C-alpha cells in the first residue's frame, strides 16, 4: 500500500515533524501536537503514507478530520478518530485540496497593489493563481487597520496588520477594474458544502481567522458584489489566456500566496518563464523566494513568507497576513 516506496513513512514522519516545529508552533497548539504525534508514531505515519504523495500534507489530512467532525482533542483522541474513520478520511482527502482562502493576506498584498496602481495610474486587473473561492480578489471591498490605525476602506471584514520598516500603505484604495483567477478546482464560496470545507481548513484555536473568513464570504455573497471570474485549469496552461483578456486600459497583475509550494520545481520555473513573456506585473507571496528566472530560494525566516514584485523581494510577511516587515 506504500505508494511512495519503502521510505515514504519516514519521509511522512519527517514532514509532520517539520510542520509541528515550524508552521504550527506558536500558531495552533492542537495542530502542533497532532503533527508531533504523527512524527513520533511510526504506524500512524505509515498509514498516512498510503495516501498519494500530494495528499499527505498535514493541512489536508487534519482538515479532513475536522470536516468529518473530529473535535479539537488531544493527539490520542485524534488518532483514534483517524483510524476509526479512515475510509471516510481517505475519501475526503482524495476529493479535496488544501485550498485555504485567507482574506487577511490582502493586508500584506494591498501596499504592493497600491505601488503598481500609483506607477501605472490605471485600474488593476487582478488575476490570482490558486484563488480557491476568490476572497483575495476582493481587496477593495474590505477595510484595513495598520498598526492600530484604520487607514482604508469601510467594508467587512476589518483586516488588522502590524508592520515594521516603511511599507507604502496607500492613501486611497487602488481601483480594481476586473477580477479573475485560475485554479485546478475553483470553489463556490456561496455553496454550503464548500464553505464547510473552507472553514475546516482554518486551524484550531484561530477563532479570529474563522470570523474573518465568514465575514469575507458574506461580502462575496452580497447582492452588490460582482463575483470574480474563476476558471478551472492548470496555472501554466491558462494564465496567459487570462492576461490576454485584460483590456489595454487596465494593468494586469498576476499574484499568488502559498500556492507554488505545491508545484514541483520544474513547474515553478515554467511559471516564472511564462510570466516573463506576458504584459503583466507579478506579485509573489510564498514561503520561498522565486526569482524571475524561476530559481527557488528557501526562506530564511522560519514561518514567514517572502513578498516580491516582479522578481524583487520587498517584504517578509506573516503566513496568514497579520504582519508585514518591509525590507526595501
Positions of predicted regions on the chain:
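C-terminal substrate-binding/active-site "lid" region of AdoMet-derived donor-dependent transferases
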Residues: 261-311
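Short His-Asn-centered micro-motif
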Residues: 129, 231-233, 255-257, 285-286
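A short SAM/SAH-binding and catalytic strip from SAM-dependent methyltransferases
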Residues: 250-265
